[in-house]
Regions:
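Conserved PLP-binding active-site segment in aminotransferase class I/II-type PLP enzymes
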Residues: 1-57, 61, 83, 108, ...
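PLP-dependent aminotransferase-like
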Residues: 12, 56-145, 152
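Basic phosphate/pyrophosphate-binding loop/patch that engages nucleotide-derived ligands
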Residues: 131-140, 182-202, 291-292, 296-307
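Glycine-centered flexible beta-alpha turn that most often forms the glycine-rich phosphate-binding loop
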Residues: 144, 310-363
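Active-site region of PLP-dependent enzymes
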Residues: 148-154, 161-280
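Conserved small-domain helix->loop->beta segment predominantly found in fold-type I
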Residues: 212-225, 256-333, 412
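PLP-dependent enzyme catalytic core of the Aspartate aminotransferase-like
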Residues: 339-412
Length: 412
């Protein structure tokens, strides 16, 4: 039996000291700043927590409106609700599947506090245009880059463009087994106010300099601190993030070159000057081309061994293609939570007394989002990333062409 460390024996933790300290989070934060060029970064427990921290930092609260998209994972709007504010949905661009900046402009009201675009599937939203729009109206852009941590716009890393950007480590392109995320900003005031949303008072007291922030340091954050085990893994992922992303881009470009001429399938669009991180490889299916539904085509793909899902339509409720969704899917404005407008009871936050113009969410509001949700299909990780290469991509192409060659068998 080992001698107690108290009396000169070896420490039980030994080299695992980092698992109980904060230095790994600090190293990750420094690495993120170096990687993106942003001045400040704070690791948190998830991408949702990063978004919620950013919204809190921007002063978003009861009665405020935040423009976002319904064509996304539910957490994008969930972070708005967590701050007791109201999501106002803008439609998407039919090519990039990201926020339509002109529709966002049309949705701005005196109650608009922020714009929350989503870099969906890894393609950046039109952040430069949205930043100009925000400047015109004195509002803040909180970018949801949870699926696009290694993307770029005109050579500038995502995380160094919007007023504040949220990252997530729960999936590609940077992954940590225990999850986690971070918010990044070049604005010291936003950085410090964001700490109040979920950091321990001792953390706030050690980082903040603003007397107003320090005054509220003991307000009782929600404990949105990142697990040090996740931080340890994320640091390693960050070291070769660009190399892995570039390999994934090569794989996806190979797919595009091979399937772009197949009738009925539209391969992903990449806006000039934008670097797509390819969290998913998302195509559009034309059901009229063959008289076969998108869901039937996806069933055939999965049967061939290619994992494919209709993300917006049902990924919030199922990830196994053979399982049944809990309820009808689709863009968020069609989901029960938004149609009923009673998340916290008594109509809050949608119908609370602070809301001047309670939103009504209904079918037909977002025609592009609604159409794309019925046509998209996504090829997922890990099929797109190293060690997969062109040989593996060709297997996916072979599966698709096999289905197209036998498409009449799928007609019902």
């Amino acid at each position: 039996m080992s001698k107690l460390a108290l009396f000169g024996g070896p420490k039980a933790l030994g080299d695992a000291e980092q698992l109980k300290s904060s230095w790994r989070q600090k190293s990750m934060e420094e690495g993120l700043c170096e990687y993106t060029g942003a001045k400040y970064a704070k690791c948190v427990s998830s991408g949702t927590a990063a978004l919620a921290s950013g919204l809190f930092a921007a002063g978003v609260g009861p009665g405020d409106e935040v423009i976002t998209v319904a064509y996304t994972w539910v957490a994008s709007a969930g972070a708005i609700l967590r701050n007791n504010a109201v999501p106002i949905f803008a439609d998407i661009d039919p090519q990039t599947l990201c926020m339509d900046a002109e529709d966002a402009r049309r949705k701005i009201t005196p109650q608009t506090k922020a714009i929350l675009p989503v870099d969906f599937y890894g393609h950046p939203a039109p952040i430069p245009e949205l930043m100009e729009l925000a400047e015109e109206h004195g509002i803040v852009v909180i970018e949801d880059a949870c699926q696009a941590a290694t993307a770029e716009i005109n050579g500038v890393k995502v995380g160094n463009i919007a007023h504040l950007t949220a990252f997530s480590w729960s999936g590609k392109p940077i992954y940590a087994p225990e999850g986690g995320g971070a918010y990044l900003t070049n604005d010291r005031e936003l950085f410090e106010r964001g700490l109040l949303a979920g950091q321990h008072p001792t953390v706030i007291q050690g980082l903040a300099t603003d007397p107003e922030v320090l005054k509220h340091a003991s307000m009782g954050g929600t404990g949105d601190r990142m697990n040090p085990v996740g931080a340890t893994a994320a640091i390693q992922q960050l070291l070769d993030a660009d190399a892995r992303t570039n390999a994934r881009i090569r794989n996806c470009e190979y797919l595009t070159a091979k399937i772009s001429d197949i009738p009925g399938i539209t391969s992903p669009y990449v806006r000039p000057g934008y670097k797509h991180a390819y969290h998913y490889y998302t195509c559009l299916w034309d059901p009229d081309e063959y008289g076969v539904s998108r869901d039937r085509f996806c069933q055939a793909l999965n049967a061939e061994g290619v994992y494919a899902i209709a993300y917006v339509m049902d990924a919030n409720y199922r990830f196994a293609p053979e399982s049944e969704p809990i309820q009808a899917g689709g863009p968020l404005h069609l989901r029960t939570m938004f149609r009923e407008r009673n998340l916290y009871g008594k109509g809050c936050p949608f119908l609370c007394p602070h809301v001047k113009n309670p939103p009504v969410y209904k079918a037909g509001d977002l025609p592009v989002s609604e159409e794309m949700a019925g046509r998209e299909f996504c090829l997922s990780q890990p099929d797109l990333s190293p060690p997969c290469d062109e040989k593996d991509m060709q297997l996916i192409v072979d599966a698709i062409t096999k289905i197209i060659d036998n498409i009449d068998e799928l007609k019902e």
